[in-house]
Amino acid sequence: MSSSFLLFAFACSPSEEVFVPMEKISDQGKILSIGDFKSTGFKKSNEYNVEDLTGATSAFYGFMKNELGDPEDYELRFYSSHNDAVNLGTKFAENIVGDDACISKDCSMWLENLNQRTHLEGGRNNTWNGTKAPKYNNYVIYNNLILFCPGYNEEDSMENCTVFIDKLEESNSN
């Protein structure tokens, strides 16, 4: 039986659905690797050198298409265990997400392919103002994985993380 994280609850009327995000930190006792994501639709673009990423065993950058068919970028960092992901990876994760994210060389804790953790911020009328902004506004720690997810804000990013992990759970239950 699949433990699907994409849950919906009825709101004020039967036609309204409310998104319920997954827990930010969860451990099902599994040890994941990049091979577990082959059937999810995730396409690996780069494998990062993790020599300077304390405790990480591997890290990857890639994309998955959303429900509209548009590619969205994700970063996956793997650790030996869930405890390592939490205890060694959290400070690196917090450093690059959200409103206080550090996406410049002078303050980022891990510089490997830093440019892939940024995007140009949009201005009025969908014009680009050329200001660098963090690509990932949230992350989840799922078993031994830290998953960084794109989004316009923390809630949008968490929804993308939940959908991503839900696809993993669905593919592993088949």
Which residues are covered by each model-predicted region?
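A short, solvent-exposed beta-edge/loop patch
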Residues: 20, 109-174
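Short, solvent-exposed recognition patches
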Residues: 34-132
